[in-house]
């Protein structure tokens, strides 16, 4: 199964490119972030014509995440199933695709350390952990894809000195994301060593 992710930063603006890319590479599953459209504006029929089922968690001109699949979409969950109030931001959607639990996630940016948006980001990451602890069977396949807005290692940014004390590289963000119940950074494991 070929699974891909793409922060499209406006699906309306990128739709021709997305259609071309999907036709060229034919992924089994494609996760999209920053669709920036309401749920009722999502082009389900265009993807259906290409052989894809689709689900979308939209929010108008902000955020928005989607999953496209040509191997089935079951058990769709919008947001977190963690017993807390619904998140007003459309930042995550879950579905089971051919036996793999897939999430398309757009983790908050955080703006700056100490800012209310940073605290929202930390809370969001805590909710992700809680959702996984409550709903994820460690023996089942899981793929969380998307725009994580977290760089856990110095080599993950072009100049670590310019990021000192900033969001994306803070210890609390990295600890919440990369010590969660099962995540393993596949991107890192397939990238060639810089040494």
Task: For the regions a language model picked out, list residue spans one by one.
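Hydrophobic alpha-helical segments, chiefly the membrane-spanning helices
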Residues: 189-195
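Extreme N-terminal starter segment of soluble prokaryotic enzymes
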Residues: 1-3
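Surface-exposed cleft-lining segments at the edges of enzyme active sites
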Residues: 107-125, 163-165
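Conserved small/polar residues in nucleotide/adenosyl-binding loops
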Residues: 178-185
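Short, surface-exposed, charged loop/turn segments at secondary-structure junctions
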Residues: 119, 154-171
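Active-site beta-strand/loop signature of hydrolases that rely on acidic residues for catalysis
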Residues: 6-7, 22-40, 102, 131-154
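Short, acidic/polar
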Residues: 12-22
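Structured beta-strand-rich core segments of catalytic domains in phosphoester-bond hydrolases
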Residues: 35-38, 42-112
